Amino acid sequence: MISTVALFWALCVVCIVNMARYFSSLRALLVVLRGCDPLLYQYVDGGGFFTSHGQPNKQMRLVWYIYAQRYRDHHDDEFIRRCERVRGQFILTSALCGLVLISMVALLIWH
């Protein structure tokens, strides 16, 4: 029989791997954004996005831009495709993080 603790740690590893994929896709999206729409790149603080002095309110602009699917009217097909990929990975990663939290609470109650 599979240990519930081992199953929990496997779920944590899957969540961390998906977070890494999400951040990698977000970084690739910013590279495409710099080339196709410099004004939007500057609006979301693309140059300082992954730095310690990045501006969270500008980072949230990009998150809400993607979450609300406002990219669908953009002129660049590559940018649209990357945004759809990032949006899907964000939803998957959010669901996995929620599942990790729920399973952690269940594991604490159960053991």
From Swiss-Prot:
Has the keyword Cell membrane been applied to this entry?
A: yes
Domain of life, source organism: Bacteria
A Pfam short name: UspB
Membrane protein topology class: Multi-pass membrane protein
Is Cell inner membrane set as a keyword in this record? Answer: yes
Q: Which UniProt keywords apply?
A: Cell inner membrane, Cell membrane, Membrane, Transmembrane, Transmembrane helix
Q: Which GO terms describe its cellular component?
A: plasma membrane
Matching entries from InterPro entries are given as:
Universal_stress_protein_B
State its location(s): Cell inner membrane
Q: Which family does it belong to?
A: Belongs to the universal stress protein B family.
What name has this protein been given in UniProt? Universal stress protein B
Q: Which organism is it from?
A: Citrobacter koseri (strain ATCC BAA-895 / CDC 4225-83 / SGSC4696)
